[in-house]
Amino acid sequence: MASFNKDLVNYLLNHPSLTYSKVNRSVEQGRGTLELFDGTEHGPALELKKMIMAMAGDFMAAHPKDPDHPFLADPPKAFEVNCWGTVYDREGRQLVHFHPPAWLSGVYYPALPASMKEAAKGRTNNIEGWIEFGRAFHLFGDRREP
């Protein structure tokens, strides 16, 4: 897996669409790509797509339609996968955002900041590389905990 992750990082760092852009408004102090699964993907990006498709299929099979559940009441009959890459500068971050057409979203980290290893061992409170779902107060006025 380490070799795959290294290859994926190199693929992203050399992707022709990786750039600083105001169009990608949720990336702060970092660069983002356009759609990676646009039909031209190859190498590690193609392998990533295959893994995601398999996992999404497994997830859907394990969570059948349930009319009494808000998430499972209307699952898609078929799905497609969209993907983009983000590379952050020091202290870069992803701003609060949402994926309106998405039924299911996920994140894959092929590389992590070194500080996360120390944080996992309880040696630092540095939040570099962390992810949090559900907190949207600065855009929507919601101050509740996720």
What spans do the regions from the language model cover?
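Non-heme Fe(II)/2-oxoglutarate
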Residues: M1-L72, R93
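Catalytic core of non-heme Fe(II) oxygenases with the double-stranded beta-helix
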Residues: F37-E47, G57-P146
